[in-house]
Each structure stands twice: as structure tokens, then as C-alpha cells.
């Protein structure tokens, strides 16, 4: 997902590379670790949330700044990314079902899940909302949706559930979902749809008169 001033995040579903070498840096072995840490790791709790949203097993990999930069160079040099990951907060690789999150997205999830931060506003709140939306978005790619506009619209509607699965109260999850929806128009055009609205074709709960 493309990042814009910690307000919106744009995710990528990277194509399978028929000409790819046997492994990329993103495929390196990682320790499984939860809690408040910033090292590169497989994050089991975030993976369980992604699996619940996707309806199938999902692995979530959190990356340190240095490792994220290495992945960026690796993907660009081998044709695996259409744009620099410098502006992307996460991507999903369908060849192995892994969700990869950048340091900012993982930090936001750590703030919410392990540090117990519940800010009313400001940069930390925006980072948490971005992180929740990124995880929901990539989970929708894992579920099988490829189109970015469809994927993001479903993610916006699942941000409340995502936040609660990560430990947020109903009231805080509601505020996170509303923040993500307020930031929705700031996404690039390919992530937007006029049908992403209450009663629209992409409404996951058309009988419920509320949004998102």
C-alpha cells in the first residue's frame, strides 16, 4: 500500500514471477516473535487476524527498516514491483501466501496490540489506523481479491473487525474505522470506487443502514 503522510496506505499484490530466481530476500528464514519489538520477524498474532479475515491460513512478516530497504532493492532489480516500496506499507505475494508489512505498519499494529495505546488523535492515531487498514487490505488480497479498488473497499468495511481482533474496544475500533473511511478519498484513483458506499455494489452488508 502506498503511504501518504501517515493518513492512507496503499497495498500491492505482487505478481508471480515466472522468471524469478529460487528465492528473494523477502523469503529468508525469520524468527517467530510477538510483542513490542521492531526486529524482522514472523508475527503470529497478526497472522491469526489475517487468517481470520482471509478465511485461509496467512503468514504476516514484519520487517525492520534495513530489511525493508533490501527487499525493495531486490524486488525492483528482478522486476517484482511496479513501484518503489519506499511509498508502500505492505504487499502480498500470491506465490506463497505471505503478507509483508513495512516498519511503520508493524509499529502501528504493535502500538494497538501490545502497547495498548488508544490515542484520540494525532500522529500515533493516524499510524494505528493506517496499520489496521493495511493489514485488512492485504488480508483481502490473501482471500483472493486482486482488483485494488475492490480490495480496499472491503478492507475499509473490515477495519472495525480487524481492530477488535487486535484487542481494541468497540468504541476505539469504531474510531479507527471512521478515520480510515475519512482518509479513503486520499488514495490513488486505482484504489477508489464510486460503488464503495452505503448501499453500493461493494457494500458487504447492504441490509444494514450504516457505513463503513
Regions found by a protein language model. Give the residues of each.
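Bacterial N-terminal signal peptides
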Residues: 7-15
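Positively charged n-region of N-terminal signal peptides that target proteins for export
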Residues: 1-4
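Active-site recognition of the HExxH zinc-binding catalytic motif
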Residues: 129-156
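Long, well-structured alpha-helical subdomains associated
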Residues: 164-212
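A metal-dependent hydrolase signature that marks the N-terminal structural subdomain at the beginning
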Residues: 18-105, 109-112, 117, 211
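Sequence contexts marking disulfide-bonded cysteines in secreted/extracellular proteins
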Residues: 61-63, 105-107, 152-154, 195-199
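Surface-exposed patches in mature extracellular/periplasmic domains of secreted proteins
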Residues: 60-62, 144-150, 164-176
